Structures are given as structure tokens and as C-alpha cells.
From Swiss-Prot:
Motif ('HIGH' region) on chain: 8-18
Name of the coding gene: gltX2
Name of protein: Glutamate--tRNA ligase 2
Record-level GO BP terms: glutamyl-tRNA aminoacylation
Subunit structure: Monomer.
Amino acid sequence: MMKSRFCPSPTGLMHLGNARTALFNYLFAKSKDGIFLLRIEDTDVERSKETFDLGLQEDLRWLNLEWQEGPGADEGNGPYHQSKRQAIYDDYYQRLEEADQAYPCFCSEEQLRLSRKIQRSAGKPPRYAGTCRSLSAAEIEKKKAEGLQPALRFRVPDDEVVVFADLVRGEQRFQTNDIGDFIIRRANGTSPFMFCNAIDDALMGVSHVLRGEDHLTNTPRQLLILQALELPVPTYAHIALIVGPDGSPLSKRHGSRGIKELRDNGYLPLALTNYLARLGHYYASDELLSLAELAKGFNVESLSKSPAKFNAQQLDYWQKQTVNQLPNDDFWEWAGSELQSQIPTDKDDLFLTTVKPNVSFPRDVAYWVNVCFGKTLNLETAQSELLRATGNRYFEEAFEAFKKFGKDLNSVVSHLKEKLNLKGKPLYQPLRIALTGAEHGPELAKLILIMDYETIQNRLQEACQ
């Protein structure tokens, strides 16, 4: 059975790049009636935190990316936290050492740094120089007796080519002479990503590894490990990374935020999944799609090789589409029951049909609740100046027109046009700002029907002051 996986490190909060990788793996699995696996790669003891671990799982559940295998869903391949799998890795280290495919390395970080510097100055790519590659058993024991703790390096074969088919990028070829022997166990005994990631994919039956292109150069190393241990090799697909509009790595200055922050600000999970699913993947439909529909339309061949540019406006577009299709009960659960409680029952439906297409976040709903039912508006300086420049007569005539015609906006506007000889923006804008505090928004005629007559009178009187 097809099995994809998402394996974050709990060293920070989930960001958009993580979320997109998780989403693509989820959609890939669902498109093939496969299994989506979650594994927590927490071998970085110093930086890994339980709060981040739980936060990552909470974010995935909020996005409705439920895993069929992983923490809380053991299918016999656990544990699913790498910090609890060290005995498994130690067994494979022993196998590699016994087969002379790995050897202890006593080089200090200072020695390695100097070696890299010399190689770069000679115009060569930095790789391990092989200082400890041919140490005898006696030399190894002597160094250990001196109290030196070795790392363990994988012995990369010379003069070979590692070839694999990437589902996104086609055939990939790497010369082993360019790779160099690499560390598979740190001197402190812990396992780095390179090793345990590959071992776990094989042991957990992962058939497809879909990950960022920043892992592309890790793949030949992991293939060498799996081949040396005669373990199953998954199919790889390396997706383009998300970048800012200027092509630089995505950051907060581009408007990128963590999933928790987006959730706290009122973004909806379906908005995020619709945006992220299209960020580097083509969908024929430009309609808001459910997760099941996104999965049905997902195809690895539709993934772009080019970097995907983050666009905050596009994310907000999908947010607005998602809000607009929310059932009324879900809308108020999202916006907040305390806001709903401020709306008279007989005006609830009219408020929703009028305001819903114009809001994207709970703060927008709060704004229009205050417009329709609040006592005062907080005008910006420019708006106050516009009302002053309009002059009191405009608002006095508007006051009289509402007394005469009630909430018939067309008649009120016709009255102002006739009395003041106005048209266009000078005719409509002052009235909208005086009544709503906004230059744009829901249809004014409908907002007026929602407002109490007293509210309309008070705001016109305030505009005269």
C-alpha cells in the first residue's frame, strides 16, 4: 500500500512551509487510497521541546490533516518519536561497523573546519578528507583509551554514481567522489537526521518521500545507507520551496506567519489548505474545494519545479471565499457568540446576508456589529476632515430626508441631490462615512435597514459637530 509521511522536528512552531509539505503528503496519500504517517524527529535533544511537539500535532489536527499512523495511532511500527528509537539505530550501526561500511572518526570540529578552509582555498568542494578512514584497530583503541569519543562515519564507496528517479525533477545523478564520508552517529551517541530518517522510512514501510528540494543532496547519502543495509528504498519527490515575492527565502517581512498565529488571527483551515494546495501545484478548478476534492485533483506531475512565491493577498482571497460559504452556525462559532448576542434576533438573518460577503476575519464582523448596533464610531483623522469639509448643511438635509422618507435610501439620496446639486462621490461618500465610518463595505441601503432609526439620527447629528 502507498504510504507517505510527514516528519517534523519539534524545535519550533509550524510555519507555512511545514504545513504545505504536510498537506502535499496528506493529499498524495489520499489520492492513492494510501496511508499518511506522522513521525516526530526529536533527536536534537537540546532544541526539541514537548510544547512544540504537541503544538505541531494540534496544528495538523486543526488543518484536518489527520494521520492514520503515528503518535496515538500505532500500527506496529512505533514508537513514532525518534528519541525512543535509539536501540533500533544502534543495531544498524553495529551491522555497518561489522561490514566495515562505517568507521569511528576522532576529528575535532576545529580540525574539520581547517580542512574545509584549505579545500575551499584550493577551489575544491568541502568534503571529509578521510583522516580517520584507515585507522588500525590498535590506533582506534589507543584514541579511545585517551578518552576521545568518536563519531561514526559512513564509508562512501569510491568512483560510483548514485542514480534515482525523482517524481518531480526526473533522473538525478550524484558522483560518490563528491559526497565524502559523512557522520551517521554523533560523538555524543545521538543519531543525526541523515541516518535515522532513512532507517525509519524503511522500517515503517514508507513508499513515497515527498519533501523540500533542500533535502535533495541528502537523498544520495540516504540511498547509500539503505543499499548498504539491504533495506527497502522509497520513491522520492523533491518539491520547490516557498519564497517571498522578491524571490528571497520566505520570512515574516513577506507577511509569512506560523500556523498558530494564523489560527489565532481568525484564518480558517480550509482557506489555508486551498491556498497552500495551489502554491506550486496546478488545479484546473478555481473554486473553493474540500480536502477530499483537493486530494482527488492532486497529482505529483502537477507539482512545479520552480519556487512557489508566497502571496498574502491570495491567502486572504481564499479566506474570504471560505468565510462566505460557512453555514450560519459555523460562522458564529468562528466569529464569536458574544458578537451574535449583540444582534436582535429579528435582524440576525438580514445582518448575515448583508455583511457576510464583506468580512474575512472576526474583527471585521465586530466592526460591522458596532456599525449596526453600537453607539459611536471611531473615525480616522482623514474621515473626520472629509466630514468637516462636506459642511453641516449636507448632514442637516440628510437628517430631514430620513425623517421624511424613513429608511428609503434612494429617496434620501434624491433629496440630497436636488437640494445640494451634488452627484457622484460627493453625493454618496459623506453619507456612507457618517453612518458606517468606512468608505467601502456592504450595501448601504441594507445596512440602513438593519440600523435603528435613532442610530442613524445620532450619527448624522455627530457629523454636524
